[in-house]
């Protein structure tokens, strides 16, 4: 039986923000559940799932295999966007890491960052600093979400921020 995934409220909010039909690059994919969910729900045609660490990438590979989605989800070891080539995806997901790390990932590869049509960003910390970074770079925050997880409302930014790249 193929692996069926269900997402936490936080990760569901991130997945729900992806524009239907876009190919996705998931940086820091961890276990690969968001990538698997997006393909299983036929929301996206494919995902490039990347992580810097071997362990999480190996877990993601197991999950993708169990889900029978190897032809739709490409796994790649990458420090941020270093292994990404512009044009491989229209949507960037960067979720579950600190705002400063996320800023570093986006700043280090500006041409790659600017190649995305949308970025779905879910910083876990340093929200004010990260929002200032986005503002200073001229990004438009086009959608935010507030979610209830584990009995607590998480700040709007915890649900995700969609940034329109212009």
What feature does the model see in each segment?
Residues 2-7, 88, 100-166:
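Class I S-adenosyl-L-methionine
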Residues 5-21:
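Conserved alpha-helix/loop element of class I SAM-dependent methyltransferases that forms part
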Residues 21-30:
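Conserved class I S-adenosyl-L-methionine
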Residues 32, 36:
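Glycine-rich SAM-binding Motif I of class I
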Residues 46-51:
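Conserved SAM-binding motif I beta-strand of class I
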Residues 88-96:
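Short SAM/SAH-binding signature in class I
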């Amino acid at each position: 039986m193929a692996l069926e995934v269900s997402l936490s409220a936080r990760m569901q909010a991130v997945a729900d923000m992806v524009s239907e039909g876009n190919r996705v690059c998931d940086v820091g994919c961890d276990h690969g559940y968001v990538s698997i969910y997006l393909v299983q729900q036929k929301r996206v045609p494919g995902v490039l799932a990347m992580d810097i660490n071997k362990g999480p990438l190996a877990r993601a590979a197991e999950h993708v295999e169990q889900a029978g989605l190897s032809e739709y989800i490409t796994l790649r070891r990458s420090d941020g966007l270093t292994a990404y080539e512009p044009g491989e995806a229209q949507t960037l997901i960067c979720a579950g890491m600190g705002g400063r790390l996320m800023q570093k990932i986006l700043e280090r590869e500006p041409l790659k960052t600017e190649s995305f049509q949308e970025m779905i960003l879910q910083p876990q910390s340093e929200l004010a600093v990260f929002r200032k970074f986005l503002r200073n770079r001229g990004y438009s925050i086009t959608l935010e979400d507030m979610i209830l997880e584990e009995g607590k409302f998480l700040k709007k930014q915890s649900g995700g921020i969609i940034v329109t790249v212009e």
